[in-house]
C-alpha cells in the first residue's frame, strides 16, 4: 500500500519555491461578529459526520507567510534584462588583433569561463544589485541610444514610435545606433523624390536651366545628415543633448598651390547627373575664301543607234506564219505613202489571200477531215440531209455542160471545177423544215452548234472505248523520244566549257536511254502470276501475302477463319469458270 502524507500550505510553498513555481496564496480569515467561527476540532467533527477528509492541525495559522512571490518575480525580471542588455551590447564585428577585449564582450568568453560562477545562486547574486551600490554602479549596464530629432520636433500630443535606423552590415566603422520615426523618414524621402521629379520635368520642358548635378544633390543630402546627427537627443543612463564634436580641419600642405577648377564646365559625361545642362555645339562656318567650287561631271553625249530587225533574214517564218508587228506610236518622221505604194500593198494582200485559199483547198483534197478557216464558205458544203444518207456514201454529180463537181458528203468537202463555181446538187436541194422550225439546223449561229450537230449525225468517228490506255501512253512516249532524238539546229556562240557540258549531257542522256531499254527487254505485260499453297490450291494475291506474313511472323489464324478460308477454296475449285483467271493461256 502506498503511504499518503499530508503537507501544509507552507511546506507546499517551500517545495514550489525550490522548483521555481508560483506559491499558493494564503488568505486570513476575518473575525466577523455576526457569524460564528468554528475551531479546527469542531470542523473536523462535522467533516467526519459528513464523511469528508479531516483537516490536519496547523500551528501559527494566523501568521502571514513571507513575501516570497514578489522577490522571485523581481529576480526573473532582472535576469531577462541582463540577457537582453548583453545581446544589445554585443559587437557585430570581429575584434582586431591589437584591440583589448572587454569583460562583457562575447569574444572574451574563453578567458573568463573559469571566473563566471556556474551555480544558479552565485549567478543570481552577481546579477542582483547590492545593498550599498550607488546609482553609477546600476547604470553601468544601461545602453545609451541616440535620437535623430530634437525635443521641439517631437510633438507631446501625439505618440511617436521610434525604431532603429537601418545601417549597412559591411560598414567597418563604429557607427552609433540612432532611433528615428519610420513614418517621418518615409515622408521626407517621398517629398525629396517629388522635388527631384519636378526638377527633371521642368528641365525637359525647358522651363528652367539648371546648373545642378547629381553630385551636388548627394553632397547636400550628406550635409543634412551631418547637421541632424550633430544635435540629437540621448536616451539611456545619461539623458540630454549631445554636443557636436570639435573637428579640426586639416591644414593644406605648405609650399604647394591648390587650384580649384569650375566643376560645371569641366564635368565629364560619366560624372554628369540627370540635371546636367544641355550643350549645343555651334555650327562651324567655313571661310568663304577656302571654299572651292564643286566641279560637275558632264556625261558623254549619247550616240544615235540604228535598230536592226534580225527577223528579216528568217524568210521561212514569213511563209509559214507571217508575223505583223503593230506599232501604235506615231512619229512625225514617217512620210505619207503615195497611191502607188497603196496599190502595191493591196495587190500584195490579194496575192496572200489567194495563196492561202489555194493551200486550204490542197489540204481539203489531201485529208479526210474538215478544214475550218476564217471564212464561212465551208458551211455551205454541209448538207442537212445527213441522217438520210450513210456515213460513208460519196456521190458524184455531173453538170449539164460536162464539168464534174466531186463532193465528199460525209466530211463536207467540195472540189470546185475550173469553169464555173457552182455548188453541188446536195446543197441546193436542202430539205424544208416547216414542221419544227426550232429543231432546224442553223450552221451560221456558231461553230459549237455546227460541231454538235455533226456529232449527233455520227459524222465524226469517235475512238474505240475498248482500247487500252497503255497504247496512248506508248504513243506519247514514242513521240517524246522522237522529239528528244531530233537534232535542233540553231545559231549561237558557245565557250569551251559549255560545249564540254553539252557533250556530257548528251552522253548521259543516251546512256540512260540504253539502260532503260535494256531493263524493258524482258518485260512482257501478258504474264499472269498464279499463287498456290502447299496442297496445290489456288490462292488470291491477298490470301497468298497473308500466308507469307503469318509464316514469317510465326502466327496463324483461329479455327473460325481457317474454316472460312477452306470453304472459300473449295468453292473456287467447284467453279470451272475461274480456271482461266489463275493459269497461263496455252494459246
Curated annotation (Swiss-Prot):
Compositional bias per record (Basic residues), positions renumbered to this chain: 548-566
InterPro entries linked to this entry: HIND, SNU66/SART1
Sorted UniProt keywords: mRNA processing, mRNA splicing, Nucleus, Phosphoprotein, Ribonucleoprotein, Spliceosome
Cellular component per GO, a single term: spliceosomal complex
Highest taxon of the lineage: Eukaryota
Locations listed in the record: Nucleus
A Pfam match: SART-1
Keyword Cell division: no
Regions annotated as coiled coil: none
Residues covered by region (Disordered): 403-423, 471-526, 547-587
Keyword Protease: no
Transmembrane segments: none
Example GO biological process: mRNA splicing, via spliceosome
Basic and acidic residues: bias regions: 478-501
Function: Component of the U4/U6.U5 tri-snRNP particle, one of the building blocks of the spliceosome. Required for pre-mRNA splicing.
Assigned protein family: Belongs to the SNU66/SART1 family.
Family matches, as PANTHER family: SQUAMOUS CELL CARCINOMA ANTIGEN RECOGNISED BY CYTOTOXIC T LYMPHOCYTES, U4_U6.U5 TRI-SNRNP-ASSOCIATED PROTEIN 1
Quaternary structure annotation from Swiss-Prot or TrEMBL: Component of the U4/U6-U5 tri-snRNP complex composed of the U4, U6 and U5 snRNAs and at least PRP3, PRP4, PRP6, PRP8, PRP18, PRP31, PRP38, SNU13, SNU23, SNU66, SNU114, SPP381, SMB1, SMD1, SMD2, SMD3, SMX2, SMX3, LSM2, LSM3, LSM4, LSM5, LSM6, LSM7, LSM8, BRR2 and DIB1. Interacts with the pre-mRNA-splicing helicase BRR2 and the ubiquitin-like modifier HUB1.
Name assigned to this protein: 66 kDa U4/U6.U5 small nuclear ribonucleoprotein component
Designated gene of the protein: SNU66
Amino acid at each position: 500500500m502506498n503511504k499518503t502524507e499530508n503537507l501544509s500550505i507552507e511546506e507546499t510553498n517551500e517545495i514550489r519555491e525550490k522548483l521555481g513555481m508560483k506559491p499558493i496564496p494564503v488568505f486570513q480569515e476575518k473575525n466577523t461578529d455576526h457569524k460564528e467561527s468554528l475551531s479546527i476540532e469542531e470542523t473536523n467533527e462535522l467533516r467526519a459526520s459528513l464523511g469528508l477528509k479531516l483537516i490536519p492541525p496547523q500551528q501559527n495559522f494566523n501568521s502571514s507567510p513571507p513575501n516570497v512571490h514578489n522577490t522571485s518575480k523581481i529576480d526573473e525580471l532582472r535576469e531577462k534584462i541582463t540577457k537582453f542588455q548583453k545581446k544589445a551590447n554585443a559587437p557585430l564585428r570581429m575584434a582586431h588583433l591589437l584591440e583589448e577585449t572587454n569583460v562583457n564582450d562575447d569574444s572574451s568568453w574563453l578567458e573568463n569561463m573559469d571566473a563566471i560562477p556556474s551555480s544558479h545562486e552565485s549567478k543570481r547574486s552577481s546579477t542582483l544589485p547590492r545593498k550599498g551600490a550607488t546609482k553609477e554602479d546600476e547604470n553601468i549596464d544601461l545602453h545609451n541610444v541616440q535620437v535623430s530629432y530634437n525635443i521641439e520636433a517631437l510633438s507631446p500630443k501625439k505618440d511617436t514610435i521610434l525604431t532603429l535606423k537601418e545601417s549597412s552590415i559591411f560598414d567597418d566603422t563604429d557607427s552609433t545606433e540612432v532611433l528615428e520615426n519610420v513614418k517621418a523618414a518615409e515622408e521626407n524621402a517621398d517629398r525629396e523624390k517629388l522635388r527631384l521629379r519636378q526638377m527633371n520635368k521642368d528641365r525637359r520642358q525647358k522651363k528652367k536651366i539648371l546648373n545642378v548635378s547629381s553630385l551636388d544633390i548627394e553632397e547636400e543630402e550628406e550635409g543634412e545628415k551631418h547637421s541632424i546627427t550633430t544635435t540629437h537627443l540621448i536616451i539611456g543612463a545619461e539623458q540630454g543633448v549631445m554636443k557636436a564634436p570639435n573637428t579640426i580641419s586639416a591644414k593644406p600642405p605648405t609650399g604647394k598651390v591648390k587650384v580649384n577648377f569650375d566643376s560645371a564646365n569641366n564635368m565629364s559625361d560619366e560624372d554628369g547627373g540627370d540635371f546636367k545642362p544641355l550643350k549645343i555645339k555651334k555650327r562651324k562656318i567655313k571661310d568663304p575664301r577656302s571654299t572651292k567650287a564643286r566641279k560637275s561631271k558632264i556625261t558623254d553625249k549619247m550616240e544615235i543607234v540604228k535598230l536592226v530587225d534580225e527577223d528579216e533574214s528568217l524568210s521561212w517564218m514569213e511563209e509559214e506564219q507571217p508575223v505583223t508587228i503593230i506599232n501604235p506610236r506615231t512619229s512625225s518622221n514617217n512620210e505619207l505613202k503615195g497611191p502607188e505604194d497603196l496599190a502595191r500593198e493591196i495587190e500584195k494582200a490579194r496575192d496572200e489571200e489567194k495563196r492561202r485559199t489555194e493551200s486550204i483547198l490542197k489540204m481539203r483534197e489531201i485529208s479526210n477531215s474538215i478544214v475550218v478557216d476564217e471564212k464561212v464558205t465551208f458551211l455551205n458544203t454541209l448538207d442537212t440531209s445527213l441522217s438520210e444518207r450513210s456515213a460513208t456514201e460519196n456521190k458524184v454529180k455531173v453538170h449539164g455542160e460536162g464539168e464534174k463537181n466531186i463532193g465528199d458528203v460525209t466530211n463536207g468537202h467540195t472540189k470546185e471545177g475550173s469553169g464555173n463555181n457552182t455548188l453541188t446538187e446536195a446543197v441546193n436541194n436542202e430539205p424544208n423544215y416547216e414542221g419544227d422550225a426550232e429543231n432546224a439546223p442553223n450552221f451560221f449561229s456558231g461553230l459549237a452548234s455546227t460541231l454538235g450537230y455533226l456529232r449527233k449525225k455520227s459524222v465524226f468517228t469517235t475512238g474505240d472505248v475498248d482500247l487500252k490506255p497503255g497504247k496512248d501512253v506508248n504513243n506519247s512516249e514514242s513521240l517524246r523520244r522522237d522529239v528528244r532524238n531530233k537534232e535542233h539546229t540553231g545559231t549561237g556562240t558557245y565557250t569551251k566549257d559549255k560545249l564540254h557540258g553539252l557533250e556530257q549531257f548528251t552522253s548521259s542522256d543516251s546512256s540512260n536511254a540504253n539502260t532503260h531499254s535494256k531493263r524493258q527487254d524482258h518485260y512482257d505485260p501478258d504474264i499472269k502470276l498464279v499463287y498456290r499453297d502447299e496442297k496445290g490450291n489456288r490462292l488470291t494475291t491477298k490470301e497468298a501475302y497473308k500466308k507469307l506474313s503469318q509464316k514469317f511472323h510465326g502466327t496463324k489464324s483461329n479455327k473460325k477463319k481457317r474454316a472460312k478460308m477452306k470453304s472459300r477454296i473449295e468453292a473456287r475449285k467447284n467453279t470451272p469458270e475461274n480456271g482461266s483467271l489463275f493459269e497461263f493461256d496455252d494459246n
